[in-house]
């Protein structure tokens, strides 16, 4: 963030946040699809602290399924350099479900002309091996409970849909 701030202190940032449990599961699925992840999802989650404790490398970050979902730490780093007026945080689920409305809000924030209609096409779609199981969902719900509450406070959001 400091390098961006040094480059352009007036820059406007748009940040997209996804339900951290869904993000973790999608991340794991991508690693499985690329044959980089030997563990089942729950084992991978429980092994994560050991795996990412290595010196920071791209390889170790590949397995940061949970760690990357602690958005408040990342946002605090952003807000250390940029005032909130320069940062527009978007909930991924709003973008997915109300794409044009969400994009119009982003365009307005950026001060640019809105596009009449944006083509709706998903990118980087990887077929999921399976859906997330109830035990895994419960585990992640407990892991992210305090984080989600902190985000609700920090952003003034209702994240009840992230608590399931």
Q: What is the predicted role of each segment?
A:
Residues 1-39, 57-101, 146, 153-155:
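PAPS-dependent sulfotransferase catalytic domain
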């Amino acid at each position: 963030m400091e390098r961006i701030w040094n480059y352009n202190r007036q820059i406007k940032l748009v940040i997209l946040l996804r339900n951290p449990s869904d993000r973790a599961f999608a991340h794991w699925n991508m690693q499985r699809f690329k044959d980089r992840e030997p563990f089942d999802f729950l084992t991978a989650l429980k092994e994560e602290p050991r795996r990412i404790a290595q010196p920071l490398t791209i390889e170790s970050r590949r397995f940061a399924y949970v760690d990357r979902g602690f958005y408040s730490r990342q946002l605090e780093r952003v807000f250390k350099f940029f005032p909130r007026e320069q940062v527009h945080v978007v909930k991924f689920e709003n973008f997915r479900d109300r794409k044009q409305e969400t994009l119009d809000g982003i365009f307005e924030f950026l001060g640019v002309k809105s596009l009449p209609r944006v083509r709706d096409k998903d990118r980087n779609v990887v077929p999921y091996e399976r859906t997330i199981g109830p035990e895994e969902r419960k585990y992640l719900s407990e892991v992210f409970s305090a984080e989600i509450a902190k985000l609700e406070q920090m952003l003034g959001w209702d994240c009840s849909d992230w608590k399931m």
